[in-house]
Amino acid sequence: MAGRSGDSDEDLLKAVRLIKFLYQSNPPPNPEGTRQARRNRRRRWRERQRQIHSISERILSTYLGRSAEPVPLQLPPLERLTLDCNEDCGTSGTQGVGSPQILVESPTVLESGTKE
């Protein structure tokens, strides 16, 4: 693995092998039996899958030395965010992504119930 020392590569491979073993130890449920029995087996299987997933995250965070959770992104207050489609709307699917328009004064969306 590029940019890593050999020792951490071995640790990472060991962690991946362990996680692979955990997932292989929980095969999908047998499709035989009554509807209720199949439903119960699927429910228990999904719960085990969730447990394996959380254990896998803990293993990776231990071996990689960092949190599995992403760093929270600081956003401005929702009241100040608006979609501005005045210039070149629809020309590109990614145009304007990443730079939200911020209004100094937020417009009134709902009036007090009177029609104009």
Curated annotation (Swiss-Prot):
A motif (Nuclear localization signal and RNA-binding (RRE)) lies at residues 34-50. It is found in: Host nucleus, Host nucleolus; Host cytoplasm. Keywords: AIDS, Host cytoplasm, Host nucleus, Host-virus interaction, Methylation, mRNA transport, Phosphoprotein, RNA-binding, Transport. The modification Phosphoserine is found at S5, S8, S92, S99. The keyword RNA-binding applies. GO terms for biological process: mRNA transport; viral process. InterPro entries: REV_protein. It comes from the Viruses. Residues 36-47 have a biased composition (Basic residues). Its main location: host cell. It holds the Pfam family REV. One of its GO terms (cellular component) is host cell nucleolus. Residues 23-49, 92-116 are annotated as: Disordered. GO terms for molecular function: DNA-binding transcription factor activity; RNA binding. Residues 18-26 are annotated as: Homomultimerization. Asymmetrically arginine dimethylated at one site by host PRMT6. Methylation impairs the RNA-binding activity and export of viral RNA from the nucleus to the cytoplasm. Phosphorylated by protein kinase CK2. Presence of, and maybe binding to the N-terminus of the regulatory beta subunit of CK2 is necessary for CK2-mediated Rev's phosphorylation. A motif (Nuclear export signal and binding to XPO1) lies at residues 73-84. Signal peptide: none annotated. Belongs to the HIV-1 REV protein family. Escorts unspliced or incompletely spliced viral pre-mRNAs (late transcripts) out of the nucleus of infected cells. These pre-mRNAs carry a recognition sequence called Rev responsive element (RRE) located in the env gene, that is not present in fully spliced viral mRNAs (early transcripts). This function is essential since most viral proteins are translated from unspliced or partially spliced pre-mRNAs which cannot exit the nucleus by the pathway used by fully processed cellular mRNAs. Rev itself is translated from a fully spliced mRNA that readily exits the nucleus. The infectious clone pNL4-3 is a chimeric provirus that consists of DNA from HIV isolates NY5 (5' half) and BRU (3' half). Homomultimer; when bound to the RRE. Multimeric assembly is essential for activity and may involve XPO1. Binds to human KPNB1, XPO1, TNPO1, RANBP5 and IPO7. Interacts with the viral Integrase. Interacts with human KHDRBS1. Interacts with human NAP1; this interaction decreases Rev multimerization and stimulates its activity. Interacts with human DEAD-box helicases DDX3 and DDX24; these interactions may serve for viral RNA export to the cytoplasm and packaging, respectively. The RNA-binding motif binds to the RRE, a 240 bp stem-and-loop structure present in incompletely spliced viral pre-mRNAs. This region also contains the NLS which mediates nuclear localization via KPNB1 binding and, when the N-terminal sequence is present, nucleolar targeting. These overlapping functions prevent Rev bound to RRE from undesirable return to the nucleus. When Rev binds the RRE, the NLS becomes masked while the NES remains accessible. The leucine-rich NES mediates binding to human XPO1. This is Protein Rev. It comes from Human immunodeficiency virus type 1 group M subtype B (isolate BRU/LAI) (HIV-1). The gene is rev.
